[in-house]
C-alpha cells in the first residue's frame, strides 16, 4: 500500500490528508485511496483510483469520490472475510474499505472521523440540523444529560440490515434494507434512502437481543413505541450479527452505569432535565417468585429522543426510567411506569420512591410505558434506583448486565429480604400452622408414620369448643395417652373448615389413614370434655363420611340449649334429645334411637339447632353420648387397632343389610377377631351400633359381660391375639381372665345397655369391625351379626328370661369351623347341669310366656366346644344355650321338621328354626350345630342380659331381599317411624328358616321399616308366631325393641323360642329372621 507523500512537498496535493492502498471488501481488489480535506473549492471527500500512478499523474478522474458530508456515520467493522473494515454510511449505500491490519484501520478511521467532524463544525451543524437522524449523541457521549454535545458522528454504531417480515417487522411494515443505528440510549431503524428514522426504540424497552447465524433479533416490551414484539433482521454473516449483539449489549451496560445515584447538587442543578423515579412493583411484604423472576439490573432511558431527521430533542429534556424486575427470565430490564399501583414498596422506602407523593409503582406486568416526568416534579430522591436486575438471552444472545442497585441495598431474590423469598404472605390469608407444614399430611404418611408426641394433633383438626379438654393420641393406632389433654384448640389451624376456636364447632374434613384408598375427608368432631383417663379412646373419631356427607354440622354445647322443634336430629353420631315430643327417629344404622332414660346423665350429645341428623351409614354413635369419639382399640392388645380398613369401599347413604353383608349393626364386642388373617378381605365397617353397653345397676362384684366379635374363622378365646377394633370387656378388667359363674338373683334387673365403656373399664369400644368374605362387588355395606358371649356376673334376677333364677356363668364361645359363616355367634350360656339345650327350635302356644329356661333349672358352663362339619355358610350363628356337660348328640328325629340342620347345607347363614322340640333333648349333634346356633338366635335376648343382640329377621319370601336395620322404639313413648311395608304388631313374626344364598343378596336401599317393640303383656300372650299380613313385601330385617317392663315376667318359663321379654329398663335390640319359605309356613300352620 502506498503512502501519500508529504503535502508540503507536493504543492498540487495540498488538501490530501491520507493516501494508501486499501481493498474493496467484495471484490478484494486493491485500490489507491486518497482522503482529501475540505477546501474553498471542494468538500472533504474520500477518493480512490486504480493505482497510485494514475493519481500522481492526474491521468484521469478518480474511480469514486465520496463526500464525507454525505455520510451520516463512519464505523469500524469486521466480517468473516475482512477483520479490519471501515464503513461509511451514506443515505443510499454503505461504502466500506478493508485495511491490512488494525493499525492501518485505526489510522484511516480516525482520519475519516476528524474530517467528518470538521466538516460539521465548519458548517455549524453542531445543533444536528444537518444530521441524518437529528440525534445529538456523538462519540463523546452525553456527560451532562440534555446538553448539546460537540459535533461528531450521529450514531455510535450503524449496521445495514435486511428487515425480515416476522414479528413486529411484519406488523409495522418494517421490511427491506434498513440501517440499525445505535446511540447511547436509543436504537433507530432508518430505511435506505430515507432521511428520517422509521422507528426509534429506547434501550430500556429492549427485553432481550440475540443472534443466530447471520440473523439478529431484538425483543422489545410493550412500553416500546411499537409495542411488544421482536424485530428480526439479516446481516452479511454471523460475525456481523455477533458484533451487533455485543455492541448493543455494551451500550445497555453503559446506560445502566450512567444512571447511578447522583448528589443533590447535581440533581438540583439539572432539574430542568427530569429524570423518572426508577421504581418497581413491590409487595407490602414479599411478592411470590412468579412476580419477581431473576434479579436484573434496572436501566433508564430517554423518552424524548427524536428521529435522525427530526433535529434536536424538544426542549432539550428527556425522561428516563428503570425497568421492572418482573420481566421474564433472560429479558432486559425495562422502565417502571409512573402510572400504576399506588402501593409503596415498603414502609422504609415509601418517601424515597415518591416524587412528592405523585409517583406510583407500575404493576408487575411484562411491559410498562415510559412517561416523562415534568421538570417541576424533580426531586433529590428521584434518582434512587430500584432493583438489581439481570437478564439472559436465548440462542447466542444475551442482555446487558446492568448495575443499578437500590439505595438501601441490592437484595438478592431468594433471601428473606427480597420478594423472591417464599413466605407465608405469598399465600395470602392461609391460616395454616407452619408446624404442620413440616410433616406430611398425605394418607400414607398419616397411616404409617406416627408423629412426634408434640405434633400429634397437627394432622388433625380440633373442631371442639375452646373450653373442652380432650385427650389426643397417635393418629396411627388411635390410642390416646392417658391424662393427656388439649386445652387450646385455637392453636391448631385447619383447612377447608370454619374457625376451630369458634363455638359452636364445625365438622372438619380431614382425611384419615383408613380412607387413603377411598374418598376425601372424614368428619372429625370433639368428644365429651370430661373423660376418664381409664378410657382408652381418643378425643376424635373418624366417622368415615364421604364428601357428599361432610356437612358443616353445628352442634350446641348441651341439650339444655336445645329447643324441641318436632324433629329428630339426624346427624351421624348425635343421640336424640330426650324430649317427649320426638315424632321422628333416625333411620341410619348408626343413628341412636334408644330410650332417653338410659342416656348417660353426665352429658348429652349436642344436636343441631335445626333438629336434623345426618341420615348416613357413616354416622357413628358416641360411646359416651358425646359428639364423636375415636374408635377404641383393644386395651390388652394395643396393636389390634382399626388401622386396617383400607379395604373399605365407598358406599351410598344407605347400608346394605342383606344376609350377604358383613356384621355392622352388631353389638360392640371387645375382641375384634381375624382382622389380621383376613387382611385381603374388604372390610365394611360402618359401626352402626345404636348404643354401647352400660349396665346402670351393675355391681362391680357381680361378674363380667363378654362380648366378642368374630369375623368368621376363630372366635375370640382367652389367649386370642387377633386384631380387634371393637373389642371390649364390660364389667371385667381383663378379657383374658377366666370367668366364674355366680348365682343369678331374680330380684335384680338391668337397664338397657347404653354404652360399651363402663366406669371401671379400662378399655371400651363401640364400633365393631367384622371382616367379610369376598362378596359380589355390589353389596358394599356390612352385615348385622356379632358373636356375643354373655358372661356377666351381674345378670341376676333381671337376666334373660331364659336365664332367670339361674346362676349365670361364662358360656364358651363355640369355636367356629374354618369356613364357617360370617354371621357372628352369640353364645349365651347358663350354668345348668341338667338342662337341655335351651329353646332349641321350640314352638310354643301363642299364649305361653316367652321364656327360655325354667327358673328351677340350671345350665352348665362347661359346654364343650361344638364343632360341626365344614359347610359353606357365609354367616355365623347366634348361639344361646344352657348345655349340659354330658350331652352327646341330639337325635335328628328329636328336632322339629322346621329345625333345619345345616351340616350339609350350602346356605350362607344358619337359619333359625321354630319347630317344636322336646324339652328333654340332651344335646345337639355336632353335625347340627346350626340348629344350636338357630336356637341361640331364637332365645337370644333376655330381659336382663345386659347387651342388646341382633338376631336376624328375614321377612322376605324371595331370595333377593332388601336389607335394612332400624332402631328400636323408645320406651319413653317415642312414636314409631311410620312404615309403608308392615305394621307395628306387638306379636313377633314367626321365626322360620330357609337357606339364603349370599350371592343372591342384593343391595336395596328403598326398603321401609317398622319400629316394633314388644310390650310385656303382648309377649306373654304370644298370640301367634305367624308373620303379619303386612310382612310379605320383601323386607329382610326388623329391629325389635323388646318390652320395656319385665315386672310381669319376673318368673321364667322353659324352652321357648323367639325373642325373650326384656326388663323395663332394658330395651335390647333383636334382629329376627323371618325368612318365609313356603314349606316352612305351611308346616307352621299345620302345627298350629
UniProtKB/Swiss-Prot annotation:
SMART domains (alphabetical): IRS (SM01244), PH (SM00233), PTBI (SM00310)
Ranges for region GRB2-binding: 785-787
Gene that encodes the chain: irs1-b
Domain IRS-type PTB: 155-259
Record keyword Transmembrane present: no
Keyword Phosphoprotein applies: yes
Lineage: Eukaryota, Metazoa, Chordata, Craniata, Vertebrata
Motif (YXXM motif 5): 612-615
Position of sequence motif YXXM motif 2: 521-524
Entry keyword set: Phosphoprotein, Repeat, Transducer
PH domain residues: 15-117
Motif YXXM motif 7, residue numbers: 823-826
Ranges annotated as spanning the membrane: none
Biased composition annotated in UniProt, kind: Low complexity: 264-278, 302-312, 379-400, 408-420, 719-729
InterPro entries xref list: IRS, IRS_PTB, PH-like_dom_sf, PH_domain
Motif (YXXM motif 9): 909-912
Post-translational modification: Phosphorylation of Tyr-785 is required for grb2-binding.
Locus of motif YXXM motif 8: 875-878
Protein name: Insulin receptor substrate 1-B
Motif YXXM motif 3 boundaries: 567-570
Residues where Phosphoserine is found: 307
Motif mapping: YXXM motif 4: 584-587
Motif YXXM motif 6, chain ranges: 654-657
Residues with Phosphotyrosine modification: 48, 460, 567, 584, 612, 785, 823, 875, 1037, 1069
Biased composition range(s): Polar residues: 466-479, 499-516, 707-718, 840-863, 946-961, 980-995
A GO cellular component entry from the record: cytoplasm
Intervals of motif YXXM motif 1: 460-463
